A protein has these predicted regions:
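A hydrophobic alpha-helical transmembrane-helix feature that marks the membrane cores
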Residues: 1-232
Length: 232
């Protein structure tokens, strides 16, 4: 579960329609481009057997969070230059590597490819739905950000706790809540872009990407838990 602090910056005053449309267009273009290194990273991870969590799960998670927040910091500092774009694409490659273990486990199931397809379709459906809602909901969702942030922190704490507890029911609950919370985050971030609250497309892309990533990975986990076939 990967948080992004940039989404909690002040939305500022409304921007001109032309500027908002440009940010939205550039965000969608960069978001589409970011899927290429993600897929590449996942492919490399699956074919090399990459697994950051092969050792101590707690230490591995702390290393992962350290690397992720390092990327966040670097992207934020360079978001107004081409370096920020390259760092974002590098981050999405890293996230693809991290996703490879889950994908590899899914592909080991008889219906794994179908489950991955369903998770991708479900994520696409949620993204489309939130995109439509972001342009039709008139109410400002900015106050919702604080509650979503608290929910995200609780999810991270629960995930770390479950490393020791190893409770399947808690894992399922965390994934269900993650899908709901990051779907809400997606709506929140998209509305900020549409309303001109976010004027940097690199920052906007990072926020939207993280929501999509978390929705997909948790949807896939749930599908595997409830509908996964026998291991091949």
């Amino acid at each position: 579960m990967i948080p992004d602090m940039s989404r909690f910056q002040s939305t500022g005053s409304p921007q001109a329609v032309a500027v908002k449309n440009k940010v939205l267009k550039n965000t969608y273009m960069l978001l589409s481009a970011s899927m290429i290194p993600t897929v590449l990273g996942a492919w490399v991870g699956i074919n090399t057997g990459f697994s950051l969590f092969a050792g101590s799960p707690l230490i591995s998670m702390l290393i992962f969070l350290g690397v992720a927040f390092g990327f966040f910091y670097a992207i934020e500092k360079t978001k107004n230059s081409p370096v920020g774009v390259y760092l974002l694409l590098g981050f999405t490659f890293f996230m693809g590597l991290m996703l490879s273990r889950l994908l590899g486990f899914a592909l080991g199931m008889q219906n794994g490819a179908q489950l991955i397809g369903l998770a991708a379709a479900g994520t696409g459906g949620i993204f489309f739905g939130m995109s439509v809602l972001s342009t039709t909901i008139k109410k400002d969702l900015a106050p919702m950000g604080k509650f979503l942030f608290i929910g995200m922190i609780l999810l991270i704490v629960a995930s770390i706790a479950n490393i020791f507890l190893q409770m399947p029911a808690l894992m399922l609950t965390i994934s269900l809540l993650a899908v709901a919370i990051f779907s809400a985050f997606l709506l929140y971030d998209l509305q900020r872009i549409v309303n001109g609250g976010e004027t940097n497309y690199v920052t906007a892309t990072l926020a939207v990407y993280l929501s999509i990533y978390n929705i997909f990975s948790n949807l896939l986990f749930l599908l595997m838990a409830f509908f996964g076939g026998d291991r091949e």
